[in-house]
Each structure stands twice: as C-alpha cells, then as structure tokens.
Amino acid sequence: MNVLLTGFFGHRNLGDDLLLSQALQRVPKHYQLYIYWPAGGDAEALPFQRIRPFTMVHSWKEALRHRYRLFIYAGGGLFPSRTFGVRSLISGLLQGLTARHKALNGVGIVPKQPRRWFDLFLRTFDYCSVRDEISRKFVSEITPNVVNCGDLYWGAPLKDKALCLKNIGGGKKLVVCLANPFSATEKKDIRIQRRYELLVKQMTTIITETKSLGYLIHYMPFYMGSDEKFICDVQNFLGSHDKILRQGKDYELDTIDQLFASYDAGICMRFHSILLAVKNNVPCLAICYDHKSEQLLQEAGLSEYGIRYGIRTNEFFGEECDMDDTLLRQVLERALGDPHAFQSKALPFAQRKHQAVIDNYEQLFQLL
C-alpha cells in the first residue's frame, strides 16, 4: 500500500528539510512512500533517500497515476500567502481522488479572506493537526476535532545537553541564525534599503557585544542562497570572518540537535532556529518576524526572550516595525545573564511538545 507526502520539499530550506527527515522516519516501514517533489532533483533528494527510500513524483499529473492509502500534507506553512480560489479547490479535490484518506499533519495556516473555497477544501480531510493556536482556531471553525500538536520537529528525540557540551568542549560559544528579510528587488526601494541597513547595524552591535564577553561566534544559515547574503553583509560590517556552519560538513540533519545543544547561547531569527534553541535548552535572543515564533515563546512561557521585527505588513508577518535598540540589548542581556531561568522553562516545554507530536502520529496512522 502507498502513502503520498507533500510539503515544501527540495527548496534548500533547513527547517522544511528537518520536517521531511522526521516524516520519513514516522511513516510505517511496510508502506511504499511517494513524495511530491516539484523542486530540485535527485542530488537534492539523495540525503533523504539515505534515511528511507522513496519514489519522487515531480508533478501532480505523475502523482495521479498511483493510488494511495493516505495522502498527507506534511508540516510547514503550506498556505502562507496565496489566494485560495476555486481552481485551487478543484486541484485539491482531484489530488484527493487518488487517496482513501487525506490528512493535514502539523501544518501552519495563515488566515486569509475570503476563505470560502479554502473552507470547502478543509472539509475533505479525515484528520487535521496544526502547529500553532492561530491555525487551530482557523481550522476548528470547519473541523472541530483539529489537534494543535506543535511543529512536527518536536517529535525528534530529545538530546542530553550536558553530554553534547562534554563531547564538543571548548570555550563559550554562540550560534547566530539570521533570516534575510528582503529580496534584492525590494531593496531597490530606498526606504526598504534603509531598514535593511539599520537591521545590519543592529546585528553587528549585539554580535560585537557578545564577542566582548568572550563568546566564539558561529553562523548557521537556514534558507540556503538567501540567509548567507545577510550573514555576509553583517560580517563585512564587522570586518570579521567567523565560521559559517555548513550542512554536510559541520553537521547532518540527524546531528543538528547535538550541534545546537553544544552552544551556550544563540541569536535566533528563523522559526526553526528558535525551536532548536528551546528544544536543546540553549538560551537565546529570539527575533520574531511572524506569529508562529511569537506563539512558540508565549506557549513556552519565554516571551521575555523575544523581540518583534515586522518585515512587512500582511497576514503572515503582521504589522511592519523595526526593533528598538534599548529593548534589543535588554533581551540579549537577559538571554546571556541567567541561563537557568531560560532552561527551567524550556526543558519541560520541549518534553510536552515531544509527547504531543508522538500522540499526533498515533492518531494519524490510525487511518492506515
């Protein structure tokens, strides 16, 4: 029997790669696994094929040639900023014709209006779980039994931070995970360019402060081909050449938790970098540019470690805003000053979310 997964796969986004790595390990081994993979090719898929063999399908026309026991929308923000119209509904209905059961699994959904066609689409699912409270409230208006299990990467095994530190050793280390907020086209607008220059300056200021405290700085890009540009601009402003961590060289998907746990602190901007910090008990300054990051901190009781940066005004990012320098410094000092205060909340929260994802998968696979 066959299972089909779809998501943002093959886009060189570390967060989505982590979700896929977990999904590959969760689907029961005796099922033939198909993955809708419209972007990239065999080279991009090879690391995942090593985790578990699967058949790639590059178009919905190709996917429709098979029949599936279960069709899963597997994690991530699958409907972040598009207009879901009647054509999208028809496409979703046609895809569903190939499967006995359909499921939304740990997805994030940003409310958009009008939502009539999307509401009809939601009614076609046999099981729905989401990763945040906004998504749960949105879906529950149509499907009352929706589950908020949190992001699916919480289901990865929890690591022993003390053991990771012992294994890697060294002095104080801080990991910096920056998200490039603006495209090259956007930065042609002088107002946007000035906002970007301000952000670069703010990042260099706080990184300089951490260096003065004796921290060794490492950078970890999440969205390949984009985040490196932001990191490069920060490094150029600093006049530094600090290490940039590379997947395949410095870590693999199955060792990223051990690597993250080896750091004493972090400056985290990408959602999954904030998740990794909380999951691995790493006190961090969390720069939140969307609701899911803010909700993660709020649910964990760690809101005081976050500061909002509004990239642009829309349903996904909320209201546009820059960061206050004084508040930014205060949050950094809080993250670095008392690790135990962060860790005392992060560890039990990570344990609860881990169990929530495990319970979610048990419910999901009852459909099989």
Report residues per predicted region.
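Active-site anion-handling motifs in enzyme catalytic cores
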Residues: 1-368
